[in-house]
């Protein structure tokens, strides 16, 4: 009872403090108190509810039966919208604060909200090596189920709360992407409800134009209601090698070399300064040396990026065996390194042992309680960006990131980009090795001004035929956006499928003016 009483006393004192100082002041200057006392317990309740629900639904096999009825309900909503005169654009009815994007779309308030309650794993077919899922299924659900039966996704993006729909309509990447590509490249079929209320299934051989146009389209070609995704046999552990590298030229050469080696199942780099990095390569295995086993996902363990940094500080190479699911979600507890700005003492051993089992807070709840003042502060003094550039431009790109924003650590993740139709493809006719450069944190460049600095970075990315992930703040104008992305197939399908009066253009959903 004593911990519960202590927590209750702390909560009471916090409420008195809020009454004295005002909620907005506390949310800005003592945000960690609010997060620890309220958001962490709420996040834990959310996680337990959705995990139990997903397990029960799948075990009782009710999801496929309910799925068809739910799809018919979506079709009915779309047809009713048409009968009422199609006066506004449509969008999903999922609240903007529930998405992993740091911003909330303004269009939710003005568009017709179509309710899409599709959050179940429908089928796992180990003979065809396919999992069929609904769009709101999360990566946490997928790993919990698939790893328990000995399977996994070839590309399993990091954070637990990322949804299949978001990873298809936006994009997704992981340290296995140098072998398999982006999340869209492991998908074999999409099922959608179109602007006229009709249902369509598309694959590389059936309705192929739509299949290739859907990724990155942000729900502007139709409503995704299911997807089929490749699965591969899983092993128990990842045998992970840590290699500190110094000197930018050496870092780029080593990272490029490891990314080209297909025997590496996983390749990842953490750049701690322009001249210091740790490059990690891993392979799946069923055997582990007990003395080198590291269950990094346990709540009391150090945050992964801090653990990796120790290899740099001590200038030594390392070898560890990490349980597969722990590896997949190695950055989840610290939200990469974003949590250190929210709970500055979050990696302290005492905090980890006492409260680490509640970490991390839900990104959706952090957004919901952000407030306008804090949102503006984040916009001007915080960067969250993923830029995808050709591997051959890595050294030039890192210099540009250093000069324009100066944020560290930087996440480095290689991926192969096939030459396929759609919004995103290489400049030539052959597949090309690209890299995701992820910058998350407070810029340390002098006189940082969000708009001008980000526009400068976006200009560089366009110049090397790179791409910007669309969850992030986009400062490009429409012309610049379509210079970055190939809209030929996308615009053709929008006209063919009657999307122009049903859905906004993708730029109008992701541009800076469309979000707050």
UniProtKB/Swiss-Prot annotation:
SUPFAM superfamilies: FAD-binding/transporter-associated domain-like. Its EC number is 1.3.1.72. It comes from Homo sapiens (Human). Changing residue 471 to S: In DESMOS; complete loss of ability to convert desmosterol to cholesterol. Residues 1-22 form the signal peptide. Residues 58-234 form the FAD-binding PCMH-type domain. This is Delta(24)-sterol reductase. The gene is DHCR24. It is found in: Endoplasmic reticulum membrane; Golgi apparatus membrane.
